[in-house]
Design a protein with these regions (language model features):
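Extracytoplasmic entry segments of secretory-pathway proteins
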Residues: 1-67, 71, 143
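Hydrophobic residues positioned within well-ordered beta-strands of beta-sheet architectures
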Residues: 44, 65, 75-77, 107, ...
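Solvent-exposed coil/turn segments that connect beta secondary-structure elements
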Residues: 49-51, 72-74, 80-84, 93, ...
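Histidine- and aromatic-enriched segments that form or immediately flank copper-ligand environments
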Residues: 54-59, 83-101, 134
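Beta-strand-rich interaction surfaces with strong enrichment in secreted/lumenal proteins
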Residues: 64-67, 94-98, 108
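Surface-exposed loop/turn positions
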Residues: 67, 71-73, 103, 115
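Extracellular/periplasmic metallocenter environments
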Residues: 99-143
């Protein structure tokens, strides 16, 4: 028994530690990218209420049920609710954020292609929840 070599165990431990370090570093980098809101992002206040969405741009422009943004720009959504819990979702851009009364939650995105996308509520919010939808219009810059 005294001649038993521990090298295979040490190699196994070293490989596991290396893999765990690599996975941790990749996860940290992904979180940093997702959580970092670009400084030039335009803020849009998103308010959910039974049973529609309102959007207020930095310049005071308000939209109900539809949101117009420009391709290639970053947008920060400040999501809130006037009544009950909602959940703001743009499925095509993997945007999902809870809208809770008395609380402001933030999420950001940067559309990369012109097009139309569904906006919906992903939290049951009452009888007409199924109809709490909107449309995101990603357009060319208007210069």
């Amino acid at each position: 028994m005294g001649n038993h070599s521990n090298w295979p165990e040490w190699i196994y431990v070293a490989v596991v530690i290396a893999l765990m370090t690599w996975v941790g570093a990749e996860a940290w980098e992904a979180e940093r990218l997702v959580e970092h809101i670009p400084e030039d992002a335009e803020t849009i206040i998103v308010t959910g209420q039974q049973w529609f969405w309102t959007f207020e741009h930095e310049d005071g422009t308000k939209e109900i049920g539809e949101l117009h943004v420009e391709v290639g720009k970053a947008y920060k959504f400040e999501v809130m609710s006037k009544d009950v819990n909602h959940s703001f979702n743009i499925h095509d851009y993997v945007v999902l954020m809870d809208a809770i009364p008395g609380r402001v939650n933030t999420v950001w995105f940067a559309p990369d292609a012109v097009g139309e996308h569904d906006i919906q509520c992903r939290e049951y919010c009452g009888l007409i929840h199924y109809n709490m939808r909107g449309t995101l219009y990603v357009e060319e810059p208007s210069h």
